Amino acid sequence: MMKFKNKKKKKNSRSYTLKGTVDHVNKKYAFIEIDEFSEDIKIRSRFLKGAIHGDKVEVKVFHHLSRKNLEGEVIKIIERKTTEFIGTIQDSKGFAFFIPKNKKVFVDFFVKKRKSEKFSKNKKYLAKVVDWGNSLKKPEAKIIKCIGNIGENETEINSIIYDFDLPTEFPSEVIKETDLLNERISEKEISKRKDLRSIDTFTIDPDDAKDFDDALSLEKKDNHYLIGIHIADVSHFFNIRTTINKEAEKRATSIYLVDRTIPMLPEKLSNNLCSLKPNVDRLTYSVIIKFDIDFSIIDYWIGRTVIHSKKRFTYDDAQESINNKNGLFHEKLNLLNSIAKKIRDKRFSSGSFNFRSNEIKFKLDKNKKPVEVYKKNRKDTHKMVEEYMLLANKLVAEKIISIEKKEKKTYPFVYRIHEDPEESKVNELKNYIKQFGYTINTNEGNLANSLNGLMKEIKGKPEDRSIEKFAIRSMSKAIYSTKKEKHFGLSFRHYTHFTSPIRRFPDVMVHRLLSDYMNESKPKEKTYYDIMCKHSSKMEINASKAERESIKYKQAEFMSMFIGKKFEAVISGVTEWGVYAEIVETLCEGLIKISSMKDDHYVFDSEKMRITGRNNKKIFRLGQSIRVKVIDTDIEKRTIDLELS
């Protein structure tokens, strides 16, 4: 059998204390996430002792022989995640109550009012906690300011920003330091690098991109090809001791909400100095790969370079040039695309996953209201650029391994790892697809290829999307780590992130470490990189959650125009409280509450992920096509209510 990720064993003692972070699931209970412990601790709300979502706490853990989960109680609140919230106000004479609108905060706050003070129920406010209260006294907050009207774009997006504690403005010290950066590249700096300015280099990015952190080049020689993958040399502009670096460390990633980007770096760096804009010299870190005439890799070189991009393509521009075989660099684009396809085929045959992207995009009007929802169409040019970025990341990781072997030393480094899925998750997937007549091979070395075969088999069938979603949820989460472990999803022995330093701090760390180790520097202290890998992984997850909430908000806003309308839909989730369905035409997901299904009493089957009518025996399961009617939307809660039609 395949080797699955092992769960750590529970401690043997009946009672002990641990430190962790509160994940408040609902009004009844929360889980405490313990970093060094594989199993979360369940805490019933009455034992939280005033702790709320995100707080760091110390808990006393105890075992219930009759219960499956470890349970416990909070004995100390070590650190509050935040003291500020966005919410609404229930106004009364002489006092008011502030109700946070964060979905994971289940406490309201007493507000003292001045005599003339009035609050509107149709507005959202920012409040600061002044007293956390106790068992005898309600917590108290003061109102800082009005954020805006409920349902307006700025109000709702700011709610998401506060809910996920996202950064907004850069500190003045960071801006001052950035303003002092020199835009001119000195001849001395150029002399330290491989000069590639005469080579035809170009970028390929989305239409609305402002920061271009990667470029490609191709040179055809007599019996081989040289492909250059050129990445913005972000680490050249600030060192580890600067305030720019401290802020980038803290942010760790750029965040892409539907209507805005919250960048990791100030605009002068992200959109100007580091951006590989056309017709200007730019400092880069390059991976130059030598291919033979059969498109197999012969050798590669990694080092600091200077380039001069000759053209800024959009993905559409580049695709049109490939399709029509005309325009600037069309021969190079076609050859790059052909080589990328061969690399991709080889990667998939080696066990790399071929999950399809279902990225949702919105067209917004001048007031940032959604007027169209559509699925991002992945063209050959998207896949081509992605393939070269994957290859560069892989080769950089392999370079570090080769340095270690040569020097016979361990060099701490930042890897991107993806663990094997847990056996229980794979078995759940196997049981789920069995009802559709499919199976997968879980023997060691066969799971990835078997999953790719499954994806081909289900393509175009009604259960297609639901099985793919289930399969993705069965996988472990890719993280940053100093451990030299494989990337299961890509089927790479070693992998890192090198190609997006404008928007990811781990890539900045990789550039620095790579440069030091290639210049025969001593191995770095591992502790800092352990801390930063953990922090970067955490911030990546937080950014993803915020991005998803902004999508849900815009979906609810868009569907508010279609209340009473009927649509074809596919069941995308089944729970004990209802059925989630994705509307085919708009890609928006809503909930059909079981309480609204009046024709029978429906029973939830968690193993088969379906509900069944007790009397009529009707079955509703993942992947099933149904017809729904839009009943209501709640823009504030970011939800869509549906009923069967």
Give a label for each model feature.
Residues 14, 18, 112, 118-121, ...:
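Electropositive polyanion-binding surfaces
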Residues 29, 84-126:
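Structured, charged N-terminal subsegments at the starts of enzyme catalytic cores
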Residues 36-51, 102-118, 587-619:
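Beta-strand/loop nucleic-acid-binding surfaces
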Residues 75-94, 145-169, 257:
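Short peripheral tails and domain-boundary helices/loops at the edges of structured domains
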Residues 23-29, 64-65, 79-82, 92-94, ...:
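Short, conserved beta-turn/loop elements at beta-strand boundaries and strand-helix junctions
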Residues 1-18, 44-53, 58-83, 127-128, ...:
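Short boundary/loop segments of OB/S1/cold-shock single-stranded nucleic-acid-binding domains
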Residues 10-27, 75-94, 563-577, 628-629:
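Structural detector for short beta-strands of small beta-barrel domains
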Residues 30-34, 59-61, 97-100, 127-129, ...:
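SH3/SH3-like beta-barrel fold
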